[in-house]
Swiss-Prot record:
Gene coding for it: pheT
tRNA-binding domain location: 39-147
Residue numbers binding Mg(2+): D453, D459, E462, E463
Keyword Ligase: yes
Localisation per UniProt entry: Cytoplasm
Principal localisation: cytoplasm
GO molecular function, one term: phenylalanine-tRNA ligase activity
Domain FDX-ACB: 698-791
Protein name: Phenylalanine--tRNA ligase beta subunit
Cofactor(s) the record lists: Mg(2+)
Protein's organism: Xanthomonas euvesicatoria pv. vesicatoria (strain 85-10)
UniProt keywords, alphabetically: Aminoacyl-tRNA synthetase, ATP-binding, Cytoplasm, Ligase, Magnesium, Metal-binding, Nucleotide-binding, Protein biosynthesis, RNA-binding, tRNA-binding
Catalytic activity: tRNA(Phe) + L-phenylalanine + ATP = L-phenylalanyl-tRNA(Phe) + AMP + diphosphate + H(+)
Length: 792
């Protein structure tokens, strides 16, 4: 938001200097980005009129001008501006004037004397326009100091507004904050009512419900099309970053900047019937003021005339109904459109307008009737005309209502940590335009209709802190004894998990906790999803159900950039919808890893090979060993896993995760052209561990017996090893699978599993009879329980 310092001071009388004003604005949250002083060195610049302009005898692009500067005699000025002409009124810098770093002196240009310089707005530091001389109105008083005529010195102040402060997109809105911060009061503003002189009206119909609940319109006939924008109004616009265009357009811009209410002016003679406000229809077209033809859909609000669209509500008017230099009859529009109805619509069409910027953040719903009276008064004062009555159409049930909030003095002290005097609380809130009534425990406060951001008690406390001054809130360090939690011996902490995985040459990655719904569909993870109410984007609209979709996508991006060996892991939370509709989503901590490419870094001592299931399983078993977890693996039917190369992971009979190769079809859909091996587990079941217990070391030798069985394909090693452990009992130190074979010599439907049994007793040396008895029992159990037979 850019505005004139003098304009602001006309609404709030303060004694603060310009620097103090800028500091105050920043301190109360209206961050000042730039202050541009205007007209501070124009002491010898006056209003002058060119009486005669002839071509320079030695230069085609120069003119020799005779200029009346109000000194009794004409001054000869050589000028190269393309718009220099007889009768033009423009600023003249007299000899001795200092313009920026340039001091004006009498000089000769191509042999012709020049006693001063006719100036452009840019040369005077008033605007960026350097296309020609700064043209002043024909009735500007010749000889008057330019600074006095233009109301200088002044400054153009630009502030940066946060999205919640839509009320400060106007000079008057800023004035309320300044008044509160400087213990002043905003100058009373009464728009008054302009009495109608004619009965001419246009009917207005509201057919957009809550999106357009208020619309004011007024006909003004017989205005003077030759009327020009007065210099005071044009300068206020220019110093606010708006270039003057024509009187009617400038008046609507002026009202928007002063009050915050965007307006539009239609040429009445181009309108054919009653005004309507409705949602556009698919395929409707409209030529906008900038000459572009746009095709609309049902998401846009349109202003219609006898059914045809004539303007995009809240964004831009139409070309066919615009006001021109010949307009004599005008229809003024002042309306309230809901922010949700305007938000994002301009971006769909590539439009960015001041009106749209304000409407999508929220305009005071009570302002349209006042704004149309102010605009009417300006039109009548500057261009004449006959006003008709204001047509006021509204849907009261859809108009936002000001919030009524109970503010407790005890709550102020609790939130801010300081006591603010009751009188100061009332003064600050009333200066901000709020209605305040005292009650037993504090105050009953009603926020003004322009303050959409005031809804709860904490909003009022924030306003008090902002105006009172954050720098006046003393710094108080929190007290109390700090208690450092002792690490638990019964579980492995996350840092240890990270270190274990890093030691296995895995690199940690941190992905968004939000994923694309389409990505989860590819993984066939569609149940229990938790959608976000306000996603960052459409691609990040679902809370992740697993770590693997995001982790594998990251791995794919790395693999696509010539990374030959990618080894990633992630620790993070996953989310699932609760079974009860009203309950909060559940969340749990998971750990996942994904690898692809070479199994080992390039070296001369080992032949190159690709990473496989058993490599990553070894990494997982090393992690499990750190917590003492005994993991079991069962064939998995997860749809995202390779059907023959994936397994569900169990601990103590409970499934806690998955490991395997990502299904080739899924990898192809993700544009990954290498095999991806991955695992994901619930973290807490993995890291739980029993307190270490010292066991007796046997002084007696161990005995090893190797057995090979033919077992059906569907029988897993986990089931076989479990039977062995149950059968042998405490004599079994370890059972190792050292060979798995399928092929010649093994009948179809079976596989050969070769295992080693390591037996040991703590009290004696095992005899051959002891060992043979154990082996006999193992063979019998495996043959009986798993339909296996000993391989000869």
């Amino acid at each position: 938001m850019k505005f004139s310092e003098n304009w602001l001071r006309s609404h709030v009388p303060i004694q603060a200097t310009r620097d103090e004003l800028a500091a105050t604005l920043t301190a109360i949250g209206l961050e000042v980005e730039e202050v541009t002083p205007l007209g501070e060195s124009l002491g010898q610049v006056v209003v002058a009129r060119i009486v005669e302009a002839v071509r320079h005898p030695e230069a085609d692009r120069l003119q020799v001008c005779s200029v009346d500067a109000g000194q009794g005699e004409l001054l000869q000025i050589v000028c190269g501006a393309p718009n220099a002409r007889a009768g033009l009124v423009a600023p003249l810098a007299l000899v001795g004037a200092k313009i920026g770093e340039l001091t004006i002196t009498a000089a000769k240009l191509r042999g012709v004397a020049s006693n001063g310089m006719l100036c452009s707005a840019k040369e005077l530091g008033l605007d960026s326009d350097a296309s020609g001389l700064f043209e002043l109105p024909d009735d500007a008083p010749v000889g008057q100091a330019l600074a006095e005529y233009l109301g200088l010195p002044d400054a153009s102040i630009e502030i940066k507004l946060t999205p919640n402060r839509a009320d400060c997109f106007s000079v008057r809105g800023i004035a309320f904050d300044v008044a509160a911060a400087c213990a002043s009061e905003v100058v009373a503003f009464d728009a008054g009512m302009v009495a109608p002189v004619s009965t001419r009206t246009l009917a207005v119909e509201l057919d957009a419900g809550k999106d357009a609940p208020r619309y004011c319109g007024r006909v003004i006939e017989g205005i003077d099309p030759s009327a020009k924008t007065p210099v005071w109004l044009a300068e206020r616009l220019r110093r606010s970053g708006v270039r003057p265009v024509s009187l009617l357009v400038d008046i609507t811009q002026y009202v928007m900047l002063e009050l915050g209410q965007p307006m539009h002016a239609f040429d009445l003679d181009t309108l054919q019937g009653p005004i309507g406000v409705r949602h556009s229809r698919v395929g409707e077209q409209l030529v906008l003021l900038d000459g572009r033809q746009v095709t609309l859909d049902e998401s846009f609000l349109t202003i219609t005339d006898a059914g045809r669209p004539v303007a995009l509500a809240g964004l831009m008017g139409g070309l066919d109904t615009r006001v021109t230099d010949t307009t004599r009859n005008v229809f003024l529009e002042s309306a309230y459109f809901a922010p949700e109805a305007i938000m994002g619509r301009g971006r769909k069409l590539g439009l960015h307008t001041d009106a749209g910027h304000r409407f999508e953040r929220g305009v005071d719903p009570a302002l349209p009737p006042q704004a149309i009276e102010v605009a009417t008064r300006l039109v009548l004062e500057l261009a004449g005309g006959t006003p008709g009555p204001v047509v006021h159409a509204q849907l009261p049930e859809h108009l936002p209502q000001p919030a009524r909030i109970r503010l407790r003095r005890a709550r102020i002290a609790r939130v801010l940590g300081i006591q603010i005097d009751d009188a100061d609380v009332v003064r600050m809130l009333r200066a901000l335009g709020m209605h305040v009534e005292a009650v037993a425990e504090g105050w009953e406060v009603m926020a003004p209709s322009r303050r959409f951001d005031i809804a709860i008690e904490e909003d009022l406390i924030e306003e008090l802190a902002r105006i009172h001054g954050y720098d006046r809130v003393p710094t108080t360090l929190p007290g109390g004894a700090s208690r450092i939690a002792m690490p638990s011996e019964t579980q492995l902490d996350e840092l240890s998990v990270r270190r274990q995985l890093v030691a296995r040459e895995l690199q940690e990655t941190i992905n968004y906790a939000f994923v694309d719904a389409a990505l989860l569909e590819r993984w066939q993870l569609t149940e229990g999803l938790v959608p976000l109410a306000n996603p960052l984007s459409a691609e990040l609209a679902i809370m992740r159900l697993r770590l693997l979709p995001g982790l594998v996508a990251t791995l794919g991006r790395n693999a696509a950039r010539q990374a030959g060996r990618v080894r990633l892991f992630e620790l993070g939370k996953v989310f699932a919808a609760a079974a009860d509709a009203g309950a909060a989503p559940g969340e749990s901590q998971h750990v996942a890893a994904a690898v692809c490419g070479d199994a080992l870094a390039l070296q001369w001592g080992e032949p190159a090979r690709k990473v496989d299931f058993h490599d990553l399983k070894g990494d997982l078993m090393a992690l499990a060993a750190a917590s003492g977890a005994q993991l079991e693996f069962q064939p998995s039917t997860q749809p995202f896993g390779h059907p023959g190369r994936s397994a569900d992971i169990y601990r103590n009979g409970v499934c806690i995760g998955w490991i395997g190769q990502v299904h080739p079809r899924l990898a192809k859909a993700l544009d990954i052209d290498v095999d991806v091996i991955a695992f994901e587990l619930q973290l807490m079941p993995l890291v739980q561990r029993a307190l270490p217990r010292a066991g007796e070391l046997s002084r007696f030798p161990s005995v090893r017996r190797d057995l090979a069985f033919l077992v059906p394909d569907e029988v897993s090693w986990a089931a076989v090893s479990a039977s062995v452990r149950t059968t042998v009992g405490p004599l079994l130190r370890e059972v190792q699978l050292f060979d798995r074979y399928v092929g010649q010599g093994v009948e179809p439907g079976f596989k050969s599993l070769a295992m080693g049994l390591i037996l040991q007793d703590n009290s004696r040396t095992l005899t051959d009879r002891d060992v043979d008895a154990v082996v006999t029992d193992v063979v019998a159990v495996i043959e009986r329980e798993h339909r296996a037979r000993i391989r000869s």
